[in-house]
Amino acid sequence: MEHYISLFVKAVFIENLALSFFLGMCTFLAVSKKVTTSIGLGVAVIVVLGISVPVNNLVYHAVLAPGSLTWLGYPDADLSFLRFLTFIGVIAALVQILEMALDKFFPALYNALGIFLPLITVNCAIFGAVSFMVERNYNFGESVVYGIGAGVGWALAITLLAGIREKMKYSDVPDGLRGLGITFITVGLMALGFMSFSGISL
C-alpha cells in the first residue's frame, strides 16, 4: 500500500506533468484564465488519464509487447512499433465519449471548454503519461494509481495558475508583460516551487 501512496504523491507533486515536464502547455496556458473552467478541464484530464493509462496498459501487455501474443501461437511477435498509433486511438475514443457525456449532462462546461476539449486527444500530457507508463514498466495497479495521480497533478497546477491569473487582473503589471509574458514568468516560479518536492525520497 505504501508503494501506491508514494507513486501517487510522486505523480502529483514530484513528477508533475505540467510543472516538471512542461507537458500540455498549450491547453495549460489557454484555459487557465478562469478557475471554474480550469477545474472543469482538470476533472476531464483526470478522467481521461485515469482511464486511458490503465486501458493502454492492458492493450500494450496483451497485444503489443514482445511475446504478448504467445497465447495466440505467435511467441516471437513484437507489435510494440504500433504503440503510438494504438495509444492515440484509445485516447481519442475515450475523449470522444467524454465529450458526448459533457455535451449531454454539462452543456455550460462543454461550451466553456470549446475547442480545447477535443484537443485533449492530442494533448502531450495525456500521451506523455501513457508513454511514461510503458517506459517505467508499470503493472495494471500501478498504472491506475499513476494515471489518476498524474491527472490530479495537472489539474492542481492549472487550477493554481488560474487562481493566480484571476488575482493578477487587479495587479499593476507592466505593459510589456501583460498577457502571456507575466503568465510564463508565473509558471516558471510555480515550477521552481514544485521543484522543491524533488528532494523528497519516496
UniProtKB/Swiss-Prot annotation:
Q: Which residues cross the membrane?
A: 11-31, 35-55, 81-101, 114-134, 144-164, 180-200
Name a single GO biological process.
Answer: sodium ion transport
The alphabetized UniProt keywords are: Cell inner membrane, Cell membrane, Ion transport, Membrane, NAD, Sodium, Sodium transport, Translocase, Transmembrane, Transmembrane helix, Transport, Ubiquinone
Top-tier EC class = translocase
State its Enzyme Commission number(s). Answer: 7.2.1.1
Which InterPro entries does the entry link to? Answer: NqrDE/RnfAE, NqrDE/RnfAE_oxidrdctase, NqrE
- Record field: catalytic activity: a ubiquinone + n Na(+)(in) + NADH + H(+) = a ubiquinol + n Na(+)(out) + NAD(+)
Membrane topology term reads:
Multi-pass membrane protein
Q: Where in the cell is it found?
A: Cell inner membrane
Per the entry, what this protein does is: NQR complex catalyzes the reduction of ubiquinone-1 to ubiquinol by two successive reactions, coupled with the transport of Na(+) ions from the cytoplasm to the periplasm. NqrA to NqrE are probably involved in the second step, the conversion of ubisemiquinone to ubiquinol.
The family note in this entry says: Belongs to the NqrDE/RnfAE family.
What is the name of this protein? Na(+)-translocating NADH-quinone reductase subunit E
The organism is Pseudoalteromonas translucida (strain TAC 125)
Annotated gene: nqrE
